[in-house]
């Protein structure tokens, strides 16, 4: 039995979340009556309202109205008034991943998992399949610039989704093709140990049907180890590793883009295909690897090399992934979602390769638990930044943890040899600090999953205003 076509109003609690908003939009486009609430007004809430979806700011029981089904994200507490009333009324309550899984049953599905790179890779897979005429439905964890949204209804037989492993619910998703970009220690508050994370990813691969396959990056040692433990399922490996089925070769990172070629070698004797002169308008080897994963899927689904080449060259990127927000005094300012040490290191390495000027990193650590559990890694992931400006921790509802805060990170960076790590007292002070640091050819990269994105977009104007005031 599949999701009924006739279903009463569906109420989303936390509809402004990036994952929830995408599901809500697709269900609205399928003809379901959708409504929802969020604690605060944001871009996604406004975007959904513009599409005719009834939205509420703030959580109140009366928002449920005549809803017959409630969808909740894992961020919603049990004492939420809307959730409490729904349970009092004995309404069905489903988690975000359960509803996503129901939508996936309508199509053949590609699910993109991994600690980092999921959103960009999901966007790239969607772009390549679209270029091949497959017209996929897409539900992503970030805004795809070409669509202006994180969700899109396609007329084709395929759906491409980002599979969020943070709470383990990605194991509910019925994928025909599974991508694993990497596996690092993250979300330990849920999993408890790195071994538990690795076990979850193994289960994710084991869940694919016998006619499906997994695309896995063997440049990452944990993923390569997992490949060796998977039995009875087809695996397509990718990476710079000379043993990869889809091998990334000759990566050239200059001018804010990536040039490379890819060699495809099937396990069938004698099969070999080389794609040369590939260009991705995004910097960083990590993004070239993401593109290689997407290319592997597109090739398997019959997309031509020329369509792949054209789509990669025209890729418009994803919001909050090395997104340029403006320029001041010849310095470029960027916004990036990177909040894990592996992500931060990759972004700063890409910035370093893209400019001959200085790289100034502005970081807002996200969650005390993440800073504490990965503290040593945070203290060593900023080597490619000439200057690191550390803002107060964005708590995301967590209580402070003694010894793991802004000042501890500044001290940790310095003790491990960084030459210029400084604390930011208030966001209002950022423009003045940058004005004394950045000049022509420099990159200012704002990093974090909190509200630092707002600082990144405000910074060019604030710097210009400072200049006018000084004049």
Curated annotation (Swiss-Prot):
The gene is murC. Its EC number is 6.3.2.8. ATP binds at residues 114-120. One of its GO terms (biological process) is cell wall organization. InterPro entries: Mur-like_cat_sf, Mur_ligase_C, Mur_ligase_C_dom_sf, Mur_ligase_cen, Mur_ligase_N, MurCDEF_pg_biosynth, UDP-N-AcMur_Ala_ligase_MurC. It comes from the Bacteria. The keyword Transmembrane helix does not apply. Cell wall formation. HAMAP family: MurC. One of its GO terms (cellular component) is cytoplasm. It is found in: Cytoplasm. It comes from Methylobacterium nodulans (strain LMG 21967 / CNCM I-2342 / ORS 2060). This is UDP-N-acetylmuramate--L-alanine ligase. Pathway: Cell wall biogenesis; peptidoglycan biosynthesis.
